[in-house]
Amino acid sequence: LTYYKILLKQKNKLTTYKKLVDLLLKIQKIKPKTKIKNIINGTHEIKKYSSKQLHRETDLFFDWYLPLFLNKKKILKIKKKTKKILSQLYKNLNFPNSYFVHRDYHSQNLMKVGNRVGVIDSQDALIGNPTYDLVSLIDDVRLRTSKKLKKQIYDYYLKKINKIYRVNSQK
């Protein structure tokens, strides 16, 4: 049973989201390794988030969304200008980039397993910014959430992460 189906039926979703945020924070506390063992070929390399990866993700906008509204010539013109601006922005990004990032941490990849939460579909994971997965959870396109609920989830995450950082900085 996915948390998507659970959340669809719930009126008060905050308690469930808190449980999912708690698991996310546990995952984020794990020191990521760039190479992990797997059963198929021995090891798998988890890459770091990079400008190249960010460009691949923004390309989705040009490849999938804009063709619904514009011709190829206009898309190429917009893409060229936008890529130039984005390249500058990506160079100036300065955020913590040393966390395990699932990259698909949303309700359909979170399973109810007894009283625990199971996480599936992690083959696209990277080492990157911890907020990526939080945004995937809060802004899940499959579920409508109010601004109020999004803020409550975000505030809960901040409160919990601030406690973690305070504890870690005192060690």
PLM region spans:
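Glycan-recognition and catalytic cores of secretory/periplasmic carbohydrate-active enzymes
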Residues: P32-H44, S51-H55, H102, S107, ...
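ATP-binding pocket architecture of kinase catalytic cores
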Residues: L1-R56, N94
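An alpha-helical support segment within catalytic cores of ATP-dependent transferases
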Residues: P32-K35, H44-E45, K52-Q53, E57-F100, ...
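Flexible, glycine- and charge-enriched loops at secondary-structure boundaries
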Residues: Q10-Y17, I75, K79, L143, ...
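Active-site acidic catalytic loop and adjacent metal/ATP-binding pocket
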Residues: I27-Q28, L86-L134, V141-T145
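Active-site activation/catalytic loop segments of kinase-like enzymes and analogous catalytic loops
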Residues: D59-F69, P130-R166
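Hydrophobic, secondary-structure "cap" segments at the distal end of domains
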Residues: Q170-K171
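Charged catalytic carboxylate motif
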Residues: K19, L23, K81, I85, ...
